[in-house]
Amino acid sequence: MQAVEMEKKAGNENPMREVVLDKVVINIGVGESGERHKKAYSLLEELVEQKPAITYAKMTIKNFGIRKGEAIGIKVTLRGEKALKFLKDALTVKENRLSRKSIGEGYFAFGIAEHIDLPGVDYDPDVGIFGMDVCVSLKRRGYRVARRRRKKAKIATSHRVTKEDTIRWLESLGVIVE
């Protein structure tokens, strides 16, 4: 840890310690299958220009009218430039402000009440209005070591992304953390 502090004082920032965007996951929980689910699917596909994945109910909940195996949601994972572009648009909906409570160690999440709040999206009466959850994951370079198939290894505690690192990364995007 002392080596990291000394390096920062010297002004030599190690490129492996840089916090980078890993992925952005967008989820629309429709709660029912059928026509409304198909509309949400086409909406998300149109928004991100990528094919979404359908999520299915894990168990039957009679009070909600949901059966096990029924399609009840849609999600899509964005990476790279596409993820950063969508994230910036989604943060403008929240007026570039996030609560400290929605930020964790290497991740943060927020919700968008209406998709028509996103820039460049107009209301279509045929589709309706859908809300969505946006979950963002951050990492440092070298995290593949923990996920790869061969010669897996643990990530050192000093190399993990902390809550303070996440807040600093958000502030570099111009987001105000309250």
UniProtKB/Swiss-Prot annotation:
Signal peptide: none annotated. PROSITE patterns: RIBOSOMAL_L5. One of its GO terms (molecular function) is rRNA binding. It comes from the Archaea. Keywords: Ribonucleoprotein, Ribosomal protein, RNA-binding, rRNA-binding, tRNA-binding. GO terms for cellular component: ribonucleoprotein complex; ribosome. GO terms for biological process: translation. InterPro entries: Ribosomal_uL5, Ribosomal_uL5_arc, Ribosomal_uL5_C, Ribosomal_uL5_CS, Ribosomal_uL5_dom_sf, Ribosomal_uL5_N. Part of the 50S ribosomal subunit; contacts the 5S rRNA and probably tRNA. Forms a bridge to the 30S subunit in the 70S ribosome. Belongs to the universal ribosomal protein uL5 family. This is one of the proteins that bind and probably mediate the attachment of the 5S RNA into the large ribosomal subunit, where it forms part of the central protuberance. In the 70S ribosome it contacts protein S13 of the 30S subunit (bridge B1b), connecting the 2 subunits; this bridge is implicated in subunit movement. May contact the P site tRNA; the 5S rRNA and some of its associated proteins might help stabilize positioning of ribosome-bound tRNAs. HAMAP family: Ribosomal_uL5_A (MF_01333_A). This is Large ribosomal subunit protein uL5.
